[in-house]
Every structure is written in structure tokens, then in C-alpha cells.
């Protein structure tokens, strides 16, 4: 028993040391819901005028997040019972608005679209346009890539992003 009590402060010191280096706390303690952090950041990412501008990497990443949020609201047990009953329709409308702006067919499954947009965003952050076009092949390829730089304002996307943040940050909600 004394050994266990002696080990407790050492364990606490080790944990605090692990948390104090430059890595994010999420590297030490994984988040159960991978959409929680993007949801919390959504109002800051989507809530400003000109939030996309002419940045195709940001546009692709945002399209991928909206696809992932909509898919989660339809299928993920952590998201299928929201406090806000209009969250799912808001996300479906936002997904449709984003897809129409990018020329993506409504028949493309959300998981496929989310992977395509995430792959394109990663390639664009590395300045690899051919890889981005290849990643976008399932959702329209070069035509979709060309539209990433010329997106109009997407008000339904902005509203849905705020609703997602409210869902995650609301009282009594610890995802």
C-alpha cells in the first residue's frame, strides 16, 4: 500500500511533464470525437466575411469538414441525437450549397467526398496541384479544382458551422 501511495506523485509528475512539452494536449490524451475540435473552431473559420477568399486549400478543407459533419449527423451515434432538432437539416442544406458551388453531384457519398476534399486540401497545403486534382477525381477532378478558388459567399454553410459549434459547446454537452 505504501508503495502505491509513493508511486502516485511520481505518476502525476510524469503526466504533468508529458503535458508540458510543446505538443498539444490532444497528442497526449486523444479526443473521443474527431469532429469536436473542428466543430469548436467552425465559427472562427466560417464566420468571417471572405473566410475562404481565393484560398483553394481552405475551401477544400472546409468542404471536407461540412461533408464530415453532415455524414456524422446522419450516421454517427455521437451526433445523431442533437439538442438542436434542426441541426441535421441545416447540415444537409449546407452540404448541398457547397456541392452546388463546386459542381459536385448529390449522388456522391459523403464519406467519398470528405476523403476527396481532405486529400485535396492536404495536397494544396504542400503546393501539389496535380495531386489535388487527382484527389478530387471522385467529385469532379479538374472542374471542381477550378471552382475552389472562385467560391461565392455560402451563407447556409456559415449558419450550419455556427449551429455545429453551438451543439458542441452547449451546456451539458461534453463530447
Per-range role (PLM):
Residues 46-175:
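Mature extracellular/secreted ectodomains of secretory-pathway proteins
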Residues 13-36:
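Bacterial Sec signal peptide processing site at the extreme N-terminus
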Residues 7-10, 37, 89, 139:
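Residue-level signal for the start and early helices of compact helical domains
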Residues 1-19:
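Sec-dependent bacterial lipoprotein signal peptides
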Residues 28, 32-58:
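Long, hydrophobic N-terminal alpha-helical segment
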Amino acid at each position: 500500500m505504501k508503495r502505491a501511495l509513493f508511486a502516485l506523485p511520481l505518476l502525476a509528475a510524469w503526466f504533468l511533464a508529458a503535458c508540458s512539452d510543446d505538443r498539444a494536449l490532444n497528442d497526449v490524451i486523444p479526443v473521443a470525437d474527431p469532429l469536436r475540435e473542428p466543430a469548436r473552431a467552425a465559427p472562427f473559420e466560417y464566420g468571417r466575411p471572405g473566410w475562404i477568399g481565393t484560398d483553394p486549400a481552405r475551401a477544400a478543407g472546409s468542404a471536407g469538414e461540412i461533408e464530415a459533419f453532415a455524414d456524422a449527423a446522419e450516421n454517427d451515434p455521437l451526433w445523431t441525437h442533437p439538442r438542436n432538432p434542426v441541426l441535421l437539416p441545416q447540415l444537409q442544406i449546407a452540404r448541398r450549397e457547397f456541392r452546388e458551388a463546386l459542381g459536385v453531384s448529390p449522388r456522391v457519398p459523403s464519406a467519398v467526398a470528405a476523403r476527396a476534399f481532405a486529400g485535396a486540401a492536404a495536397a494544396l497545403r504542400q503546393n501539389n496541384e496535380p495531386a489535388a486534382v487527382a484527389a478530387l477525381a471522385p467529385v469532379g477532378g479538374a472542374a471542381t479544382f477550378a471552382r475552389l478558388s472562385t467560391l461565392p459567399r455560402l451563407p447556409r454553410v456559415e449558419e450550419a458551422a455556427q449551429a455545429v459549434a453551438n451543439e458542441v459547446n452547449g451546456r451539458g454537452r461534453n463530447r
